[in-house]
C-alpha cells in the first residue's frame, strides 16, 4: 500500500471524505488522492517520493512556481516579528497602494482572508450601495461557497453532481438569478424585465470553474453597457484571473472596466488572502466609513502580506506575462498536435497562463452546454495516464489548469512525452 493510500485511509476517520476541500478527494477521476510533502519550482513531490510536473499550482496562486526563494525569505523575515497583530500594519498599506497601481479600476481595496470572503463582501456592498436585493450570476461560474452563490455553481459542485448545494435556504437562492454564460441577450432581456431589482452582476471574466471558458467577443463589453443602462454594479470575480492573464487582470486583458473586483490566490503568494475593491464612491460605503459591515480577524495578516507583496513585485517585471503565456501556448499546441495525430477529439482553451482541456469534437468551447457535452470518462483515463507519466493535472474535467514561470523546456518535454503515450492509449 502506498503512503498516500495509508494517509487517506487514516484521514477519513476524522476528516469528512478524508480531505479539506472536496475536489482533492479524486472522486471525479477515481483512485486515491495524492498526498504531497514538498513542492519546488514546477514540481510537486508526493509522500512516496514520486515527482510530478505540476499544472495545478495550488489551484492558481503559484505563478512563480513553488517555494520561490524571494517569497520564502520575505515570509521568514516577517516571521521574526510575529504571526498576527489584529491591528493595522505598514505592509497592508503597501499592498493597497501596489494593487491600486496595478489595476486601474481599483481606487480603494479591502483585504480579507479568502476569495469566498471577497465575493461575499463585494455582493453585500453592491446590495448596500444600490438598495436592491437580487443578483445575477452565470451557469458554471463559481464564486465561493457563500449561500447565495451556490446556485449552478460549476467547479467542485459540478464535479460532485450537486449543482445546487443542500443547506442553502430557498429564501436566499430566490434572490440569485442564473443566466447562461456568454449569452448577452439573456442579460439584456432579464434586466429589461427586473433591472430595478438587481444590485449587481457578478461574473468570472474567464469562467475558470467549468474548466476554462474565455468570454465570447462582445460579452464583457455588453455586460458593462447593460449595467450602466440599469444602474447595476458590475463585479468581476478575478480570484483566478487576477494578476495571471495580465498584470492588471482580465479587465486589463480584455479592456473592460468593472465597478468592483475580487481577488485571491496570486495576491497572497500562496498564503490565505483575498481582496475586493473598486470605485471609491462604492467602497466608501464599507464600515467604518459607511453602513455596510465587513470585518475579519486575520484580514491583512502580515505573513500573507509579505508573501503577496513579494509575488506581485516579481511578476511586475517587463515580459513576465508574455513568457508565461508563450509557454502555455506551446504546451497546448503540443497537446493538440498529439491528440490530432492519435485521432482523439480534443479542444484546448487559454487565457494567458490558465488553460482548459476538453475531450470534445466541438469547434470551440463557448457555453456551459459545450462543457457538459465533453467526454468526462475519457478525461478520467487521460488524467491517470498523465499521472503515470509524471504530470499532475487538476483531478476534475471541470477545473482550469495553471502554468508558472518555472515551467520551461524540460517540463514541456516531460508533459508532451506523457501526453503522446496517453493519447495513444486512449485510441
Swiss-Prot record:
EC class name: isomerase
Pfam family, one: Aminotran_3
Protein name per its UniProtKB record: Glutamate-1-semialdehyde 2,1-aminomutase
E.C. number: 5.4.3.8
GO molecular function: glutamate-1-semialdehyde 2,1-aminomutase activity; pyridoxal phosphate binding; transaminase activity
Single GO BP term: protoporphyrinogen IX biosynthetic process
Subunit-level organization: Homodimer.
Pathway assigned in UniProt: Porphyrin-containing compound metabolism; protoporphyrin-IX biosynthesis; 5-aminolevulinate from L-glutamyl-tRNA(Glu): step 2/2
InterPro entries noted in UniProt: 4pyrrol_synth_GluAld_NH2Trfase, Aminotrans_3, Aminotrans_3_PPA_site, PyrdxlP-dep_Trfase, PyrdxlP-dep_Trfase_major, PyrdxlP-dep_Trfase_small
Cofactor annotation: pyridoxal 5'-phosphate
One GO cellular component, as annotated: cytoplasm
Keyword terms: Cytoplasm, Isomerase, Porphyrin biosynthesis, Pyridoxal phosphate
SUPFAM superfamilies membership: PLP-dependent transferases
Protein family: Belongs to the class-III pyridoxal-phosphate-dependent aminotransferase family. HemL subfamily.
Domain of life: Bacteria
Subcellular location: Cytoplasm
Catalytic activity: (S)-4-amino-5-oxopentanoate = 5-aminolevulinate
Modification N6-(pyridoxal phosphate)lysine, positions: 265
